[in-house]
Amino acid sequence: MASDSMSSKQARNHITKGKRQQQHQQIKNRSSISDGDGEDSFIFEANEAWKDFHGSLLRFYENGELCDVTLKVGSKLISCHKLVLACVIPYFRAMFLSEMAEAKQTLIEIRDFDGDAIEDLVKFVYSSRLTLTVDNVQPLLYAACILQVELVARACCEYMKLHFHPSNCLAVRAFAESHNRIDLMDMADQYACDHFTEVVECEDFVSVSPQHLHKLLSSSDLNIENEKQVYNAAIKWLLANPQHHSKWLDETLAQVRLPLLPVDFLMGVVAKEQIVKQNLKCRDLLDEARNYHLHLSSRAVPDFEYSIRTTPRKHTAGVLFCVGGRGGSGDPFRSIECYSINKNSWFFGPEMNSRRRHVGVISVEGKVYAVGGHDGNEHLGSMEMFDPLTNKWMMKASMNTKRRGIALASLGGPIYAIGGLDDNTCFNDVERYDIESDQWSTVAPMNTPRGGVGSVALVNHVYAVGGNDGMASLSSVERYDPHLDKWIEVKEMGQRRAGNGVSKLHGCLYVVGGFDDNSPLSSVERYDPRSNKWDYVAALTTPRGGVGIATVMGKIFAVGGHNGNAYLNTVEAFDPVLNRWELVGSVSHCRAGAGVAVCSCLTSQIRDVGHGSNNVVDCM
């Protein structure tokens, strides 16, 4: 009997459990279910209820039902619910949960607000919707900031950003500053930088605070064609604000990068400006600019100190060109890539007439010259010139000697083609090109043959650095004095190298990467002609033989090369202040033996030919 009783009880339990499971499954089919901890429990979730709840609150508000507080803003009365306000507006949450008298009041007066703005804000609390217009955005932003409704404040800032204009961006910036909206201040500043020359012509410009003017003029992001525009803006503000001269005259002029102004403008305009002449610190700034130009000339100022004022702004820094070279296929390129500093990206410019690897490249007076190299079949002596104004390459006079692995330098106008090699010989030949006459002539040869040499003009000499003499890579360095027509050896590098890049920065010569006799190098050395000494600086992030380098905005860019296993399309930049290399935007084509130079033109002048952005060729 006992066994029969147990069997009957187990059967009932089994039937009951089965019914529960069936009901559970039916409920699951109707709603969202998740199992709880108990075997026979479940959690019922009805997301639709939230929509009903939200809709009911909105209807209560619109119909004035169950309201327990009225906001009085001027003559406007807004009936609403304390709980709803406290859920969305931190200001009211703090008020209603405090011991303040307003916590128990049914009529709360809010002073110094726009009634329509508060009403719009309350409607947003109930509906999550807000209509922004040119007329209501400022009072709404003010209310959202004071009442701490960050969602609405951010929406107002984004709306105002969309409606920036040269005539209103400075006023918007001042409004943002008064409400400590750093995000909107930054947006307005960036717009003012992007449209600087238009903003300067607007009425508000002379009314900006000296602190704000200081911030604007110091920015490297100013969209200008030349530093004259910054100087003229500074003088315009200073002449309109004589009350600020005692404290801000020299501070304002110090934000103008006077050393980057042409000498004739410095002497003919800046030096004759009365407010500059009458201020001792302004005269010191003018002397700094003069000394910079002397330092760059043959009358060098040996102890000149570089600063931010000697560093071009982004829009006047020029365009970095990467020209020719070759990749994994072995075929030389005729393509060129141009670097946009603002976008940190490269685009393809008009192609050369000839394919060229191990080509010499230089920019002089706003034009780019590509000389010599190898086209895949033979060595070249030809030269072509790219003019950003026409976006075309034009053939110019050829060198006397066909060669690849040459280096180019420009000193006082002429272009020097230095060293190089062909299949039989490493050359010590040096040719000089006169741009006006379009003619080449020979000058004194180097003391040592140098193929794959690096070169740069520094102060009043042309330097030839490293290379290969046909037997081994070289650590020796020599420099050319055009007045003596003579090459003289200087202190040798610490590392033998060929296929290295050479550039100058802050009065020093930098040699980057290259090959020793066995492998590519990552080491970087710096030469100071004042002390005739070399020292090592931070190494590249990867070895780069056949690397192209150039200096842009106070940094040295190393483009492409070969790391011993593959051709590279990566690019890295050296910051001398941090003594560090960092990767920047990569070129599309993996390439070594390309020529790299900075052209003093605008990125917008170069026609983007529109191909190659996804065409990364075989790097192996």
Curated annotation (Swiss-Prot):
Family annotation (PROSITE patterns): BTB (PS50097)
Protein's name in the database: Kelch-like protein 8
Domain BTB residues, every copy: 67-134
Lineage start: Eukaryota, Metazoa, Chordata, Craniata, Vertebrata
Region (Disordered): 1-35
Matching PANTHER family: KELCH PROTEIN (PTHR24412), KELCH-LIKE PROTEIN 8 (PTHR24412:SF480)
Organism: Homo sapiens
SMART domains: BACK, BTB, Kelch
Listed GO CC annotations: Cul3-RING ubiquitin ligase complex; cytoplasm; nucleoplasm
Function: Substrate-specific adapter of a BCR (BTB-CUL3-RBX1) E3 ubiquitin ligase complex required for The BCR(KLHL8) ubiquitin ligase complex mediates ubiquitination and degradation of RAPSN.
Biased composition (Basic residues): 11-22
